[in-house]
Amino acid sequence: YYTTGTANVTFGGEKQITAALYKLTSGEAKVAYYTTNHGEQEPTATLTETLSAQNITLQPLDLLTSEIPEDCSLLIINAPTSDLASDDGLVDEVSMVQNYLNEGGRILLTTNAYDETPNLDALMAEFGLAREPGIVVEGDSSHALYGYPYSLFPDYGTTVETTALNGVNRSTHVMLSVAQGLTVTETEDVTAEALLNTSEEAYSKQNVNSAATTD
């Protein structure tokens, strides 16, 4: 909001992302499972309705009591606040997810900037992804909501190696609030690409109440 009036901001992020996911499933009837019991955020009504309209059903999945079903076309791990269990526990959730991915499974993973998840971080590292501590602050005012540097308007990635963003309306801004940065690197067997990028002026701040920053 501005002091001289108001401005409307359209958030089409979920529909843009689900449109890309729809391309991966070829429009056939599919089932997407979202994990539970790690403090994850439940899928929003917008996401559920959009996927349903594209013939994709959402189902909850507790990895502590169930294997990943064979009909799982997409596994969603949505901002867990507690870590996945590893091989030092009764159930090895990390290996379950790892095996699912190694067999060609697809995953949609969002992170929580405030909680430590070393097991999940180790799994991400195998695919060229590392979380940056803190939350992203945008230093370029054209890439953030006016007066709110934590509300980002990132640029779409070029996605040279994939077609994940083909057909996405790039003139529609995706707004991300209190987002966490990721370092993306290529590993021997995996090509990792950024779908959304901040400006060069953005940085991570670990303590939002201090002036300390991390480039």
Model regions and ranges:
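Short, surface-exposed patches at the edges or C-terminal ends of soluble domains, predominantly
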Residues: 1-215
